[in-house]
Amino acid sequence: PAVLAFNNAKGLFSDENLRQAVSYALNYEEFKTYFGSAYAEIPNRGFVPSTTVGYTDTEKLTTDTAKADEYMKAAGYTEKNADGFYVNADGAAAAFTLTVNAAKETHVGYAEMIKTQLEAFGIQVNLDAVDKDAYNAKTSNKFSENNITMEAAIYGYTAAGMGMGNGLGSIYVDGNHAVQGGCQVFDEAFSSILDELKAAKTIEEYYTGAAKL
């Protein structure tokens, strides 16, 4: 499985409005058609599988370009330039670099479709297809010496990774995680919930904490 991960601390996606805009601009039916099997379903928000301990149901991902446009405007990108890209008050286009492991052919396909869809919507995407070592150095706390530079990346995740640490895929999100932490979330409320999950003595206590994520 794979997910589009944003760097929440640096660059374009430190603004939640722009993360939301991308979420609503993507066409999930196309991903299902081109990359899914006959049994594929459009996932819910978040990337935690429903079979994961602590899973809480969320709304299904939907495509809504009008809502995406509202989020772009909320972020200060109110007009488009001659190339069709949203620009802010300074005339700077909404653009980001999407990092992907070039050795993972399917992941490259995901990245290319994201680029195609977002540029049709009005966000410029620069693909950064690199080898494994360069990819890890841009997306992992361990291999970057806590200097993650990616703006967004295609992340592969595993069942083992989903359950590590405090579970629920938190190692991929927690900016303080020693190995992963690509999403660079340092929010105090998020850290407090992770502490609650860690301290849980019963499954009921764990689910109570998980419901707050």
Language model features: what each stretch is:
Residues 1-10, 33:
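Extracellular/periplasmic solute-recognition and catalytic clefts
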Residues 7-11, 99-103, 130:
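Short strand-loop junctions, especially beta-strand C-caps/beta-turns
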Residues 9, 18-19, 31, 68, ...:
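Short, hydrophobic alpha-helical packing/hinge segments within bilobed ligand-binding/sensory domains
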Residues 14-116, 212:
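Append "and occasionally in soluble cytosolic enzymes with long acidic Gly/Pro-rich linkers
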Residues 32, 125-136, 166-213:
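Extracytoplasmic/peripheral linker and loop segments enriched in polar/acidic and small residues
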Residues 119-174:
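Periplasmic binding protein-like
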